[in-house]
Regions:
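Terminal RNA-binding accessory module
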Residues: 1-78, 373, 381
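Rossmann-like S-adenosyl-L-methionine
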Residues: 2-21, 235-469
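Extended interfacial segments that mediate partner engagement and assembly in macromolecular machines
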Residues: 62-74, 80-202
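Short, conserved phosphate/pyrophosphate- and ester-handling motifs at nucleotide-, phospho-/glycolipid
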Residues: 42, 181, 303
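Short, acidic/hydrophobic/Gly-rich beta-strand patch recurrent on exposed beta strands
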Residues: 25-30, 162-165, 360
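Internal alpha/beta scaffold segment
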Residues: 170-206, 210-212, 220, 234-258
Length: 469
């Protein structure tokens, strides 16, 4: 028996009052929360509901009754379809205000701890072309916008090189210009597409798993170096060679050119070996006179300039003294560890990924830093009381965990080690708030500084300074 199609209501004159979790705009209708994308506080809209849950509904705008005075003009032609920069229609100052409010709300509501005045979110000097890394997907058929479908024109089955439609693994929006990464990123992507189309290269189909061209990663450094990694679905050596030779000739600024053959059904390449086809096996980033080696698999903050501001906040909060021992937990490739090393006696870094630890050691060597020591392994297994006894009790601990936050046993070890200060850097204030509550018996929050690493998105980093009570 066919399932009866739900008959959802049309909500007229809904006032959008605020931005909620994950950057969703919301209003209330009959005391029920209604989430509406692509709106801003102050908009009054007619909304067609498309889904209902027990505590909320979701819908889309069918008519703007009144547009908010806060509304800004989106600068990207793909806004509203691409999921990359959903806050383009909100002035940047308002974005920062909402991010500050988001941090305050989550630390207060989830952490339930005493807080000082939260500093205004530190804005990014660049709000366009600020990313140093983008990954593009090849698809045999591009996603058609509603306007294209309704135009009834000849739209054909053209392929795409761009980004996935949010929530749709097999749908790709063809990107003509992206405002996230500086040149030559747009040129490389467009030229790769042109060459492949004109020379009969097949583009990947995520459902049938056919088609040679899969992905392309472009990394740009503040030093001017450029890395390109092209991912193919099979080892078609003549076509691989022809494309890479063409890109190398067309863009002499590419200093590192790699390819990967990925025959798996998913796009992850972390377990595959990149082949250096031409140039160096890395690019170099610079920060305050330090040089950082970035390989094809290396993690590096994707907003280089704002990463510097973030790390300066963390270092200032750490307030290191001569003779101090610093523990940098979840150290990644050791960027913070090396950034702080000159201000203390020694730094101990721990990270789960062995390749990241290898990069951290290389970066210390590259900069002539001799007072760092790095360990690879699961944080819960590596950091215990015996580890602290062997490496020295930390005077300061910097935490920079993944979104899931810090495991409770790790917090227990930190509490027993009793550093005089903890600096907690987080990309997820919700889990940060949970962890701060666990530290609250022994440490009080002295300062809170949100940092905007990703303009025009809801994402916010937050740095908290804790001192012993």
């Amino acid at each position: 028996m066919a399932r009866k199609k739900a008959n959802y209501p049309l909500v007229e004159g809904l006032e959008i009052t605020t931005l909620a979790a994950e950057g969703k705009a919301m209003g209330r209708w009959n005391d029920v929360v209604v989430f509406v994308p692509l709106t801003v506080p102050g908009d009054v809209v007619d909304v067609q509901i498309r889904s209902k849950r027990r505590r909320f509904m979701e819908g889309f705008v069918v008519r703007y009754v009144k547009k908010s005075p806060l509304r800004a003009e989106a600068f990207c032609e793909h806004f509203g379809v691409c999921g990359g920069c959903k806050w383009q229609n909100l002035p940047y100052g308002e974005q920062l205000r909402f991010k500050t409010d988001q941090v305050r709300d989550q630390l207060t509501r989830i952490g339930k701890i005493e807080l000082p005045e939260i500093a205004p979110c530190l804005g990014s000097a660049e709000t366009q072309f600020y990313r140093n890394k983008l990954e593009f997907t090849f698809a045999d058929r591009r996603w058609l916008t509603r306007e294209e479908i309704e135009s009834a024109g000849d739209i054909g089955d053209a392929p795409a090189v761009g980004f996935h439609i949010p929530g749709m693994f097999d749908k790709v929006l063809d990107i003509r210009k992206c405002w996230l990464q500086p040149d030559p990123s747009n040129g490389i992507r467009m030229e790769a597409k042109r060459f492949c189309v004109e020379n009969g290269y097949t583009f990947h189909n995520a459902r049938s798993h056919e088609g040679l061209m899969r992905n392309m990663i472009v990394r740009t450094a503040s030093t001017g170096e450029v890395m390109v990694i092209v991912v193919f679905n099979s080892d078609d050596r003549p076509r691989i060679t022809a494309l890479l030779d063409h890109l190398s000739a067309a863009f002499p600024e590419i200093t590192s050119l790699f390819y990967i053959v990925n025959t798996k059904f998913n796009d992850s390449v972390g377990d595959l070996d990149p082949v250096c086809y031409r140039g160096k096996d890395h690019i170099i980033e610079e920060m305050e006179g330090l040089r950082f080696k970035v390989g094809p698999k290396s993690f590096y903050q994707t907003n280089s300039a704002q990463a510097y501001e973030l790390y300066k906040v963390a270092r200032d909060f750490a307030d290191l003294k001569p003779g101090d021992i610093l523990y940098d937990l979840y150290t990644g490739t050791g960027t913070i560890a090396n950034f702080c090393a000159a201000r203390c006696d020694r730094v101990v870094g721990i990270e789960y990924v062995p390749e990241a630890i290898a990069d951290a050691e290389i970066n210390s060597e590259l900069n002539g830093i001799g007072n760092t020591r790095f360990y690879a392994g699961d944080m819960k297994a590596v950091l215990d009381d015996a580890f602290v006894a062997a490496n020295g009790r930390p005077d300061v601990v910097i935490l920079d965990p993944p979104r899931a936050g810090v495991d409770e046993p790790v917090i227990g070890v930190i509490l027993r080690a009793a550093p005089r200060r903890i600096v907690y850097v987080s990309c997820n204030p919700a889990t940060q708030a949970r962890d701060l509550a666990l530290l609250d018996a022994e440490y009080r929050v002295e300062a809170v500084q949100p940092v905007d690493m990703f303009p025009h998105t809801h994402h916010v980093e937050n740095v908290v300074k804790l001192v012993r009570r």
